[in-house]
């Protein structure tokens, strides 16, 4: 499982190093895609296929389904980890997530989120409390 928060630096070639604690979770490749709230998401290829099925079950006759699938999957990339366990982040995703040099990697149990540090700090500052969100979600399934 993927847990924790890691502060990383994006190098000159748009790569981040996968923290040692997380390396055993991944094989030699990952899928990186556009996420919500201006972050990126990293998954194992098999987990990405399961993620895709969630959206593929929505009716393709609805415009919102087609739009959501395009926005997420058109920019998804299968990326090989290099020998130093670095992930190359494609330029289009760097732009989408507004990534600068300082990056925050956040474990989300089954995937990782990649955030620009300033964007993530702004997100946290404007977020509601844990209790408020949990209360509102009590009936969600």
From Swiss-Prot:
Q: Name one GO cellular component term.
A: nucleoid
Q: Localized where?
A: Cytoplasm, Nucleoid
A GO molecular-function descriptor: DNA-binding transcription factor activity
Q: Where is the SpoVT-AbrB domain?
A: 5-47, 76-119
Pfam families hit by this protein: MraZ
Domain of life according to the entry: Bacteria
Could you tell me which InterPro entries the record lists for this protein? MraZ, MraZ_C, MraZ_dom, MraZ_sf, SpoVT-AbrB_dom, SpoVT-AbrB_sf
Q: Phenotype of the disruptant?
A: Probably essential, it was not disrupted in a global transposon mutagenesis study.
Kindly list any coiled-coil regions of this protein. none
Q: Name one GO biological process term.
A: negative regulation of DNA-templated transcription initiation
Q: Which UniProt keywords apply?
A: Cytoplasm, DNA-binding, Repeat, Transcription, Transcription regulation
Signal peptide range equals: none
Recorded hits in PANTHER family, A to Z, give: TRANSCRIPTIONAL REGULATOR MRAZ
The entry describes its oligomerization and partners as:
Forms oligomers.
HAMAP family noted in UniProt = MraZ
Q: Family assignment?
A: Belongs to the MraZ family.
Q: What is this protein called?
A: Transcriptional regulator MraZ
Which organism's genome codes for this protein? Answer: Mycoplasma genitalium (strain ATCC 33530 / DSM 19775 / NCTC 10195 / G37) (Mycoplasmoides genitalium)
The encoding gene: mraZ
């Amino acid at each position: 499982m993927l847990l924790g928060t890691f502060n990383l630096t994006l190098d000159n070639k748009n790569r981040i190093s996968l923290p040692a604690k997380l390396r055993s979770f991944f094989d030699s490749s990952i899928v990186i895609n556009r996420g919500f709230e201006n972050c990126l998401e990293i998954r194992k290829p098999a987990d990405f296929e399961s993620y895709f099925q969630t959206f593929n079950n929505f009716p393709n006759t609805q415009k919102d389904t087609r739009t959501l699938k395009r926005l997420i999957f058109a920019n998804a990339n299968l990326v090989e980890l290099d020998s130093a366990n670095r992930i190359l982040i494609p330029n289009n995703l760097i732009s989408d997530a507004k990534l600068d040099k300082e990056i925050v990697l956040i474990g989300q149990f089954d995937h990782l989120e990649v955030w620009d540090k300033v964007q993530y700090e702004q997100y946290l500052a404007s977020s509601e409390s844990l209790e408020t969100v949990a209360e509102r979600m009590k009936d969600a399934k």
